[in-house]
Amino acid sequence: TSGVAYESSFNKLLKWSWERRSKNLETFEFEVEVPNYKEIYENENIVTTWIGHETFLYQNKDINVLTDPHFTQRASPLNFAGPKRYMAPGMKIDDLPNIDVVTISHSHYDHLDYMSVKLLAEKFDNILFLVPLGLKKWFESKGIYNVRELDWWDSLIIQETLITFVPVQHWSARGLFDRNETLWGAWHFKNKFHSFIHL
């Protein structure tokens, strides 16, 4: 894609938010599958575990990567208002194996959750956060300094895995006045085992 920000009006967002609540939607239960912790902790295979929304644990024998970590109840700057989680994450932070790298795709609250990154930084001493251009300052303002900021097409190699930040069509914002002030994108992973992308 061109990487150009997708423009949509705030009125459309409000309309969608109102209409989705006013519809009489059928509710149903989900069966939650318990992760195979033995396989996760041994890390002898290529394993991807979906934790919830865009949070995935990717393991390839050499490295453990967590994408867009979100473990809290709301995707919002407020802990009492905003979009609420319907299902608990498939894993808790305390259940995670050692995490080498966390990738952040963009600054929206459902992809960059302050409490989640804070708890991860406290739990794992050597964790590295890979973030889009412009977000390092946010992390440092929260006391998290092991952060590497990447522009589109920037790459680095971590434990024999080539990680590249690639453009996608989206946008970024955490408030009313910071639209597209930080970059957004996807992460491409390539190593001797395989290649995949997290959008």
Question: Where are the language model's segments positioned?
Answer:
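Phosphate- and divalent-cation-binding pockets in alpha/beta enzyme and binding domains
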Residues: 111, 137-141
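Short amphipathic alpha-helix with an adjacent loop that forms part of the alpha/beta core around
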Residues: 90-98, 156-160, 178
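Residue-level marker for the onset of beta-strands and adjacent loop->beta junctions
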Residues: 44, 54, 125, 152, ...
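Metallo-beta-lactamase
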Residues: 1-84, 89-95, 190-199
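Divalent metal-coordination and catalytic microenvironments
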Residues: 58, 68, 106, 129, ...
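Short, polar loop motifs at secondary-structure junctions
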Residues: 132-138, 151-153
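Catalytic core of the metallo-beta-lactamase
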Residues: 54, 59-61, 157-199
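Active-site metal-binding motif and surrounding structural segment of the metallo-beta-lactamase
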Residues: 80-131, 146
